[in-house]
Structure formats: structure tokens, C-alpha cells
Amino acid sequence: MTELNPQPMLTRVESGNRTPLLPRQDPITQLPILILYPHSRCNCRCVMCDIWRSTKKEELGVDDVARWLPEWQNLGVKRVVLSGGEPLMHSDFWALCEAFRAAGIGITVLSTGILMRRDAVRLAQYCDDIVVSLDGPREVHNRIRDIPRAFEKLAEGVAAVRAVGREVTIFGRCTVQRQNFRVLRATVRAAHDLTLDRISFLAADVSTEAFNRPGGWDAERIAQVALTEEELPLLAVELEAMERECGEDFANEFIAESPDKLRRRILQYYEALNGRSDFSPIECNAPWVSTVIETDGTVRPCFFQPPLGNIFDAPSLSAILNSDEAVAWRRGLDTNRDEICRKCVCSLALRQTGGKYVQG
């Protein structure tokens, strides 16, 4: 196991106990987190994501990753986050994981949960933690995932990993949007029923090209996902009831975010989209402490910002991250003024405390 705190994106650090953010240093010589898209497919059909619509069927080769690994080790990568889509659909997924383990790099898998039962033994063998999508209680989750028995397959998968016996941290992540904002408390109960270790909530990104949305969404697609002005008071009521009824879950951090953060990052976000508020200021050092490598080799500073280059076309990842253009872009980046950053739903505020990396 690595010293990286399990799934740093979900670890809460209260303001009174915060250490400073990891510094925004240029050139980048230490990169604790690397987010990797192993392939371009998904086994769900969610309304808030278009990855499943891809017909490219691309995937990163194990030989390519093995060639890049020595440099990633030199950059101090502590954790690789295997994202998607559904990373478990990669044709040689476990060879990828074997390479990361051999390099001493911890593994986080972001999964729909559909294939977890099939792969339970190897998930327990290779992975430090698993983050599963949970969109609500059974009926809501199945409707949003738009495939038969999605919730049931998720439940079977979590149970199968638990049954292996090795302790693996399993988190849930819920994207709050029009189809589920009324059932946040029920989502917490569902997370308990599934024996998840924690549940996190975030708003839906409707503004960028991320998640296979070249050119972005038109107004009709945005309206399917983003809350309307008339729905905002109902969201406020649900968050208030959640704070009132889930006090213990907030206190012991079963719910990853504090009540105040949920109001800032979800309610205020949708208020801002409707012109009722400003977007909440964010604290983020993602472009300095992490990077995203997509299936076709595209390298981004985070999920949402434009590409910095392509790893297949460059001599190294460092050459991309530390090019004159990339350094100039980071030095000019003001996360509270940049249009993409202001609307970000998934910022990263990475700190180091007690020898571990934590988010918060």
C-alpha cells in the first residue's frame, strides 16, 4: 500500500485543521496523482455523461503504459486513478494494474459497479480503493443509469468484493441533477445499505466538453440535467433536511462533504447557472499536482481544461507539463476568474499532512 490517503478526492479536512495547499511550483517535478482513461467505453447510458456514446473503442496499450512508468515514478506519482467510462472493460486491465503495483503506485478505480462481481477477487487483490457511482436509491439509480438492474449489480459487486476478505475501501459518488436532487437523504441510506465506506455528492458539469461532449451541450441537453430556478427551493429544503437528519453521518464523515460545502458546491452552483448567485470561490491546485491522460494520449491539466499536448507525440510527460506554453498557462491561471474553473464541479485541493496526501 502507498502512503496516499485512500481516494484523496473524498477526504475532508475541516478548516481549523488545514495544512497549506501543496505549492503551485513550476516546473512540475512532483506529481502525486495521475488520472488515466484506460479506454473509451462505458456500460451505462447516463443522461449527464456522453462517454457511452463513443464509437471509437480506443484503449491504451499495456506496453505504452509500461514504457511511461519509469518517468511517472521519477515524477513521484503515488496514486493512479483509473477513470472512465468503465475502466474494467479494458481488454487487459489487470496487466495494467500489475504494472502499477510493481512500480509501487497505488490504484483507485472509478467504476459503475456493473462488473465488480465478476472481478471481485482481482479488485481486492490490486486496488487500494474503489469509487462507485451511486445516483440514488434503487429505482432512481436504475432510471439514471438506463440499463437493467444497475443497482442490483452494484450491490452484488460490492458484496462480492467485501466477501473476498481483504480490506478495500469502497466509496460512493453521487452526481446531483434534476432526476435525483429530491432523494439525497435516501441516497445516503442506500449507501449504508450497500455497506459503502463513504458517500460524496457533487453537481453535474454542464458547461465543458469533458466526458465526450465535443463542442459542449446545447440548451436542450443542459435543461435535461441542470436544475431550473423553480427547483432551487426544493433542493434547499432537501439539503436542510439532510443536515438535520444525517447529523451523525456528517460528524463521522460518512458523508464526505460538510453541510456548508454541499450548499456552496451544489445549491450555489445551480443558483449561479440560473443567474441567482455567483459561483462559489474554489481552492484548487490540480494543474500543479495532477494530470489527466485520455485514451488517445491527450494530456490535460484536469478533467475540464483544454489539452496541453499528447503523450504519443511528445518525448515525455514532463516535456508536455513543463513546456513554455504549459508553464505560462499555469502562471496566468486564476481559478476564481477563469470561466472553466469558476464552474468546476470537481476541484482538487491537495494537501500533505502526517506523510499522507489529503483533499479539503
Report residues per predicted region:
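Short clusters of small/polar residues that mark proteolytic maturation junctions
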Residues: 53, 92, 203, 303-304
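Short glycine-/acidic-enriched loop or helix-start segments at secondary-structure transitions
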Residues: 92-93, 119-120, 141-142, 211, ...
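Conserved alpha-helical substructure of the radical SAM core
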Residues: 2-129, 223-235
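Flexible mid-to-C-terminal extensions adjoining Fe-S/redox cofactors in radical SAM and related proteins
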Residues: 1-30, 52, 276-287, 292-360
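Flexible, active-site-proximal loop/turn residues at the rims of small-molecule/cofactor binding pockets
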Residues: 55, 86, 136, 205, ...
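Amphipathic alpha-helical recognition patches that constitute DNA-binding helices
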Residues: 33, 37, 171, 205, ...
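Conserved residues at the C-terminal ends of beta-strands
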Residues: 52, 83, 133, 202, ...
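Radical SAM enzyme [4Fe-4S]-AdoMet core and its adjacent flexible, acidic
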Residues: 1-4, 8-10, 103, 126-129, ...
